[in-house]
Amino acid sequence: MSERRALVTGASTGLGREMARQLAARGFRVAGTGRRERELAETARLVAAAGGECLTLEGSVCEPEVVARHAGAIRERWGGLDWLVLNAGIGDGVDARRFSAERYHRVFATNVGGAVNWLDAVLPWMIEAGHGTVAGISSLAAWRGLPGAGAYSASKIALATLLESTRVDLRGTGVRVVTVFPGFIRNRGVPTEADRGKPFLLDLEDGVRRILDGIESGRPVVHFPWPLSLPMRHVVRHLPPWAFDWLMARLAPRG
């Protein structure tokens, strides 16, 4: 059997499914969470085709009791985890002119609350074992409040800050914490209308390979692709408010 054990949240489609497949190809046993049984079954099929073992866990990361049950199933079957990949996330184009608290709460419940629930369930095992890797998938959108993306940008910087604090707190425990800031990645194997106009868009397979290579690298922070991430991190992130507002007015004019 494979030695390393990984859990990927949000593994029923897109990024999470491809992560599960590629992790299996790298020799991991893989557990994947998701809300839809049929899609999880397809993930399990792809993991098996890549030569791996897959444990599928149906349910929402937003529900602590569901996460606790899933964590118990993993520990009973495998004894623990080596990698916890906090990937589950949703987006919602919430324009402040049509503000919706319900939509904000829904985005935060998945993108932040789901990560908190899994950290609560798994961190004690990793600390006790003296090793493990926690990786959270944030976004380049975390580095500024982008137009029409208030809920998404805010949730992703909340996740990144949570992971940074966790990383500092866990120094000396043997548990690594990695924050990944990817750019645009095609969420399916074929182009869609939603991909139009996204700069430096990466194919799904390539984007996931970069994520996993980054986690394996040992770096605490991973960001890519560099033609987009470097300007975002070192220029746009530090623009004064007047300059940022001027830039956004030209890149995303109000309709």
Identify the function of each model-found stretch:
Residues 119, 155:
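Active-site helix of classical SDR
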Residues 179, 195-231:
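C-terminal helical subdomain
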Residues 87-92:
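Conserved NAD(P)H cofactor-binding loop of Rossmann-fold oxidoreductase domains
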